[in-house]
């Protein structure tokens, strides 16, 4: 891990999106001020990292700076984080989960490549995550329930934001179909491909019923 940590010293911000949930809030807030209005929510997100870990230190540093300034911050990953480089293959994704824990992610969405080490391996990995995996449309057909929590609601100074996870219905073909089947080739899991839009809309409606003032869809699609 020492060599890994040395690699992480290269600073680069993977991505940052600022979402204002109150009227008249500028798109980008000035983070140099020592005081904060607390009226913005910073959603820091990463996507398709594919084990390219060099940007994580800057993301962690930026997140820490915002929190120190009293800002509301949520950090999310939109999928395909744990596969793509030797660090992922050699640890079957566990090293990336450890790094994401250190960064301080709140939520993550399973991308199609999260399943490349097998479904069971990924499900075991999620148990070691300090953040929550979300997916509204990844369903266990044996129970009829979603494998992960469909959405999560966070309260920011009295305003509530819901984060909905969306997996690509193409995960079957972009990963390994047999991982989602029994020994007879019957599918045990679904990505709600036949009811995709209805499933997502129903989840949005449920989040609204739970008091969400804003709904943010975090999807790994395409």
What is the predicted role of each segment?
Residues 12-13, 24-26, 159, 209:
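Short, intrinsically disordered, low-complexity terminal segments
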Residues 1, 25-30:
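Intrinsically disordered, low-complexity Ser/Thr/Pro-rich tracts
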Residues 12-13, 21, 63, 70:
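Generic low-complexity, intrinsically disordered sequence content enriched
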Residues 12, 16, 20, 54-56, ...:
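Short coil-to-helix leader/linker segments, especially the first N-terminal amphipathic alpha-helix
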Residues 9, 18-27:
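C-terminal segment of classical bacterial N-terminal signal peptides
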Residues 2-12:
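Bacterial N-terminal signal peptides that target proteins for export
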Residues 30-222:
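Acidic, metal/ion-coordinating pockets
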């Amino acid at each position: 891990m020492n060599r890994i940590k040395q690699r992480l010293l290269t600073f680069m911000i993977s991505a940052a999106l600022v979402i204002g949930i109150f009227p008249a809030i500028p798109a980008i807030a000035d983070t140099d001020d020592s005081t904060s209005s607390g009226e913005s929510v910073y959603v820091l997100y990463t996507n398709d990292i594919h084990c390219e870990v060099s940007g994580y230190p800057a993301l962690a540093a930026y997140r820490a700076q915002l929190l120190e300034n009293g800002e509301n911050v949520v950090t999310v990953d939109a999928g395909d984080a744990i596969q793509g480089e030797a660090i992922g293959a050699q640890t079957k994704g566990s090293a990336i989960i450890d790094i994401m824990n250190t960064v301080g992610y709140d939520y993550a969405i399973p991308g199609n490549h999260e399943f490349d080490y097998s479904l069971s391996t990924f499900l075991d990995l999620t148990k070691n995550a300090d953040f929550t995996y979300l997916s509204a449309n990844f369903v266990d057909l044996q129970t009829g329930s979603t494998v992960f929590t469909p959405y999560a609601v966070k309260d920011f100074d009295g305003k509530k934001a819901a984060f909905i996870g969306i997996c690509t219905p193409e995960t079957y073909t972009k990963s390994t179909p047999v991982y989602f089947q029994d020994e007879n080739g019957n599918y045990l899991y679904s990505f709600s491909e036949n009811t995709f839009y209805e499933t997502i809309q129903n989840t949005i409606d449920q989040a609204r019923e739970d008091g969400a003032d804003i709904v943010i869809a975090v999807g790994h699609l395409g």
